[in-house]
Amino acid sequence: MKITLKRSVIGRPQHQVDTVKALGLKKIGDSREVQDSPAIRGMVNSVKHLLEVEA
């Protein structure tokens, strides 16, 4: 699945910043192809308000 960072992590709680970094995203507009696994889905779900997800 493809994830794209759509909103900034500035001013967000540290655990959300860490989750976005763990997903491999750094700047707004960064995209990444990730495996669709339960662990990744949980990470994406915890910061879904910052991301755009394409199946």
Curated annotation (Swiss-Prot):
GO BP field: translation
Cross-referenced InterPro entries: Ribo_uL30_ferredoxin-like_sf (IPR036919), Ribosomal_uL30_bac-type (IPR005996), Ribosomal_uL30_ferredoxin-like (IPR016082)
UniProt GO molecular function: structural constituent of ribosome
Protein family (similarity comment): Belongs to the universal ribosomal protein uL30 family.
The protein's assembly and partners: Part of the 50S ribosomal subunit.
Keywords linked to the UniProt accession: Ribonucleoprotein, Ribosomal protein
Name under which the protein is recorded: Large ribosomal subunit protein uL30
Coiled-coil residue windows: none
NCBIfam families from the UniProt entry: rpmD_bact (TIGR01308)
Record's signal peptide: none
GO cellular component assignments: cytosolic large ribosomal subunit
SUPFAM superfamilies: Ribosomal protein L30p/L7e
PANTHER family in the record: LARGE RIBOSOMAL SUBUNIT PROTEIN UL30M, MITOCHONDRIAL RIBOSOMAL PROTEIN L30
Gene that encodes it: rpmD
